[in-house]
Amino acid sequence: TAVRILPGENDVSRMTPLKTGRVPLCACGIASYYGSEGVLMFADPNWGPQPIRVITTSIASFGLGIAVAGDIDVKSPKDLKGKRVSWIRGDDALNLGTEAYLAFGGLTWDDVEKVEFPGYGRAFEGIISDQVDTAFTVSVAPPPQQLAASPRGIVWPELDPNDKEGWKRLQAVAPYFQPHKVTSAAGEYSKDNPWIGASYPYPILVANADTDPKLADSLIRVFHEDFDKYKDAAPGNGGYSLDSQNLEWVIPFHDAVVAYYKEIGEWTDAMQAHQDKLVKRQNILMQTWKTYTGNNPPSDEEAFRDGWMDARATALEAAGMNPVFR
């Protein structure tokens, strides 16, 4: 079998060939969820909600969260009240992650000192130089490693998995997060001293709903049945294990993947009900997009986005669903 890989600088560039039909698969980040919802960078006349389906995902040993300077006595998100929290211009995903962590602690942006930065790297430089106290990131990225080695040090606020109300607030902002015991993180963290935090799958192998079922079936069989053959071949491969899959996540699975999980006895009635709800949600979004774009929407980019987000929220709420994004 011949495989051709098309690299992309960001999720939009990676998802464009999937949208146009040039490729059948995308190994994407969390923007695949934004694409399925038609929000943020996908609330654009050229995009809108996409019929995305999950093949499989990887949850590895790293986490995603707010890196905090180690010298301000922060142990959980609620301790961030009154602290200097970074906000990155033009990076919705990072800012939403920060907002979700604040929500876990019962906080909003109004409860902290919001410090704007032009980019992710500058925010970490700001922590080290004592201009700000936090930045959202992947736990194993170079910037938090640099912070850990600085005089300020680093901590990762803990998210108690038993705090049901905290998790409810967090997932109301960013439903793709899930509790995770993080063993790879900058600072004094390890298998023996994990960070009890959060993560979401990365990469997320997605296809379109109409992708050839034979391809989807072949892929999920290989990922599951040949796991022992590839799990140690590269860092993070262990995250593709069946035990690591969240079968009630935020993007629907491809029909062939659902059929396979049923075949091996791993699919429950609750999972099917969740899948049906996600597919219904996506159908509502795509029909709403079709109606909105067919009724002479504003040509101004910001007005177009605002109109779409209003129409989107109205349609989802009418169906008893949480818009999440507004």
Listing of model-derived features with the role each one plays in the protein:
Residues 1, 95-112, 131, 148-151, ...:
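Ligand-binding cleft/hinge of the Venus flytrap
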Residues 13, 17, 75, 93-100, ...:
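Extracytoplasmic/secreted proteins, especially bacterial periplasmic and envelope-associated proteins
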Residues 1-90, 94-104, 115, 156:
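Short, glycine-/small- and polar/acidic-enriched structural segments
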Residues 19, 23, 71, 103-107, ...:
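Sec-exported extracytoplasmic/periplasmic mature domains
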Residues 49-52, 64-68, 155-164, 171-181, ...:
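Electropositive, surface-exposed helix/loop patches at the edges of structured domains
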Residues 139-152, 156, 214-216, 224-326:
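An extracytoplasmic/periplasmic, membrane-proximal ligand-sensing/linker region
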Residues 82-100, 176-240, 245-250:
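Ligand-binding clefts/hinges and TM-proximal coupling segments of bilobed small-molecule sensing domains
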Residues 30-32, 41-43, 72, 109-111, ...:
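Pocket-lining segment of extracytoplasmic ligand-binding domains
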